[in-house]
Amino acid sequence: MADVAIRIPKERRPRDATRAASRTAILDAARRVAARTGARELSLRGVAAEAGFAPAALYGYFRNKDELLLALAADDLTALARVMRDAGGLAGAGIAALDLLKGAETMAAASGAFAAGQGGDAERLFNGRLIAALKALSDASGLPTGSRAHQCDVVLLASALAGLALFARSGRLGALGFTPDEMIARLDSRFRG
């Protein structure tokens, strides 16, 4: 009887590992398709073809395009938290965040998933990673988070960075005569002063 109890987890591990590898392959394929066509134009059928899966197979991993976009954006948030933690200081974290966000169209594309209000695991994963990214920004910038007002400051700073990324990505920042470095320096002085 004990032998059976030991074998069951061993049988599950390869299946779980295979499922995780398949999910990773789907996300990698989705990122390639998004790079070619834009995240907003992403389709489950196109991702399935890129990943070498039957289109229906993707529904075992993601209920719809919104969930797939949320998963991509959650991965981008993990990368964002990492670069901000490694950058040191508000100016360094801001520049690193802006560089990453300029190329992360998935965040903007995923915003439509929130409007649909479907919730679920994908949204919970995104929210958890968003909190981790906000914490990394707070830590890197030295901003405290002990009060509601301080937490608002961190969210305002993150919102400013997201807006700057949108302006930079669309070419509007340069068209207005500003550089990312100049804007980050101004943010740094406003939040430090």
Question: What do the PLM-derived regions correspond to, one by one?
Answer:
Residues 1-21, 170:
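N-terminal intrinsically disordered/low-complexity leader segments
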Residues 19, 69, 73, 77, ...:
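Amphipathic, non-transmembrane alpha-helical scaffold segments
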Residues 22, 26-34, 76, 80, ...:
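Short hydrophobic clusters on alpha-helical segments that form packing/core surfaces
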Residues 25, 29, 33-67, 71:
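Helix-turn-helix
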Residues 25, 67, 92-96, 152-160, ...:
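Amphipathic alpha-helical interaction segments
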Residues 43, 108-113, 173-177:
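Short, hydrophobic secondary-structure boundary micro-motifs
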Residues 71, 82-110, 124-129, 147:
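Hydrophobic alpha-helical connector segments
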Residues 116-159, 177-192:
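Amphipathic alpha-helical packing segments from all-alpha helical-bundle domains
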